[in-house]
């Protein structure tokens, strides 16, 4: 089974970009560019998923992961 994570992007007043993985509450990251914010939040999401797998908090649905920037 595969899981697709949605990434929402928003530009802050100071010019930085914030990216958030909608399906993983609290998983958000800043970047100077959209691409940097996306890369940062993808890396963080993978860490969260790895931690959940390591602690048996996630099922097999995390075996195939896809990211889609909105």
Language-model features: where?
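Short aromatic-glycine-(Arg/Gly/Cys) micro-motifs in beta-strand/loop hairpins
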Residues: 10-22
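ATP/adenylate-binding site constellation spanning eukaryotic-like Ser/Thr protein kinases
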Residues: 21-24, 42
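Short amphipathic alpha-helical segments
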Residues: 5, 23-26
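Short, charged, surface-exposed hinge/linker loops at domain edges
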Residues: 1-6, 35-70
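A short, exposed loop/beta-hairpin motif centered on an aromatic-Gly-Thr core
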Residues: 25-36
């Amino acid at each position: 089974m595969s899981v697709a994570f949605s990434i929402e992007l928003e530009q802050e007043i100071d010019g930085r970009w914030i990216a958030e993985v909608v399906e993983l509450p609290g998983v958000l990251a800043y970047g100077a560019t959209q691409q940097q914010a996306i890369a940062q939040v993808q890396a963080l999401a993978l860490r969260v998923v790895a931690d959940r797998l390591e602690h048996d908090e996630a099922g097999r649905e995390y075996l195939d992961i896809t990211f889609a920037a909105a």
